[in-house]
Design a protein with these regions (language model features):
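Glycine-rich phosphate-binding loops at beta-strand->alpha-helix junctions
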Residues: 242, 264-294, 298-300
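Glycine-rich phosphate-binding/hydrolytic loop that grips phosphoryl groups
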Residues: 154, 276, 294-334
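Adenine-nucleotide phosphate-binding core of ATP-dependent small-molecule kinases
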Residues: 207, 218-268, 275, 322
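Active-site neighborhood for divalent-cation/phosphate handling
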Residues: 56, 60-160, 268, 298-305, ...
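Small-residue (GG/TT-enriched) beta-loop-alpha framework at ligand/catalytic clefts
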Residues: 1-18, 59, 110-218, 246
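Short hinge/gating elements
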Residues: 25-32, 66-76, 107-109, 113-118, ...
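Phosphate/pyrophosphate-binding loops at sites that engage ATP/ADP/AMP, CoA/4′-phosphopantetheine
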Residues: 43-56, 138, 211, 251-268
Length: 334
């Protein structure tokens, strides 16, 4: 779990606070909260440790309970679209329309065929309600519930000057879910959540090496070595195997996008999240995609408070991208 607090400045944003709080394994599974009390307590501990006074927050959700689709609807006035969006959504989502929260963003108000193109987002009400409740139980006030893929996009676009011709594959690697978002000119062309993340490295190292979870996690991030200062070859072999599986999942999504999208000229891949610095994963992705790859810097254009630990911020910059995107949101915006 991460918290980011930004302050708007005349020429951009300034970072006031950043921190992370570990969650007990299986507390959240595929984006669904399994232990609400544990999540609320983790939020309280994080707020206390960072000495945060801000009560109004934005949060992100992901997983199979969230559906994002690009659809076309008959052109109509904005107020008519708002009134009819649930009827339109019913044709495109696998959930009952009364069981979901729905939002949308118009990407093209009028196509050549006289239709309106938009991104439709639907999330199960019970999942949204659970996330809102754990935040309230931590004595905070949720103002925005965003989608993780879009929050990472917001954080990325705030930090990078993009050529309108660039088509970027933005992949945020979470603990158990990775968010894939293909973006051009500020518009999301394709999104998909895949149920593989950084935990796959930890779990496989633990299984193959017969060691405790915390030691396996240390090996994953390069913090546990032999007496000679060398990561065991067995660990490297396991990391490479998981990297191949993960890269294969990402490539299948990219292949689907390329096969179904006209003018799909992808220019690069940008990784974010806790496992974005795993070098064997870089090699596996680059070999499959044949595209240049870089790791996101969430603080690239963010002013840093001199009292904050720059080494800590640098080490965890890729993990903060979603938090940066969320911290730029405010209640009532779109």
């Amino acid at each position: 779990m991460k918290a980011v607090q930004l302050k708007r400045k005349t020429n951009g944003w300034a970072l006031q606070a950043f921190g992370m709080q570990p969650l007990v394994p299986q507390t959240i599974v595929d984006g669904t909260i399994m232990d609400q009390g544990a999540v609320s307590e983790a939020i309280r501990q994080l707020w206390s440790r960072l000495k945060l006074r801000q009560k109004e927050v934005a949060i992100a959700i992901a997983g199979h309970s969230v559906i994002i689709k690009k659809i076309a609807v008959p052109m109509m006035k904005p107020e008519e679209l708002a009134a009819n969006i649930r009827n339109e959504a019913e044709h495109h989502i696998p959930f009952g329309r009364d069981d979901v929260e729905i939002d949308y963003h118009v990407t093209n108000p009028m196509t050549a065929s006289g239709q309106t193109e938009l991104l439709l987002v639907a999330a199960k009400k019970e999942v949204v309600s659970d996330y809102i409740q754990v935040v309230r139980d931590a004595n905070l006030s949720p103002q925005v519930v965003d989608v993780a893929a879009f929050a990472s996009q917001n954080g990325f676009e705030a930090n990078y000057q993009l050529d309108p011709r660039d088509t970027v594959v933005l992949i945020n690697i979470g603990a158990a879910i990775s968010n894939i978002n293909i973006v051009r000119s500020g518009v999301s062309l394709f999104t998909r959540d895949v149920t593989i993340g950084g935990n796959a490295f930890t779990e496989e190292i633990q299984k193959q090496m017969g060691i405790a979870a915390d030691e396996a996690e240390a090996y994953k991030v390069g913090g546990s070595q032999t007496e000679d200062g060398v990561v065991p070859q067995e660990v490297l072999r396991v990391m490479e195997g998981v990297s191949e599986v993960m890269a294969g999942e990402f490539q299948r999504s990219l292949d689907f996008f390329l096969a179904t999208t006209a003018d799909a000229n992808v220019t690069r891949i940008v990784l974010a999240g806790g496992s974005s610095k795993v070098t064997s994963l870089h090699r596996a992705i680059e070999r499959r995609s044949r595209l240049p790859l870089e790791v996101a810097d969430a603080w690239k254009r963010v002013e840093i408070d001199p009292q904050l630990d720059r080494n800590y911020l640098s080490a965890h910059s890729p993990e903060a991208l979603i938090g940066v995107g969320l911290s730029m949101r405010s209640g009532g915006d779109k």
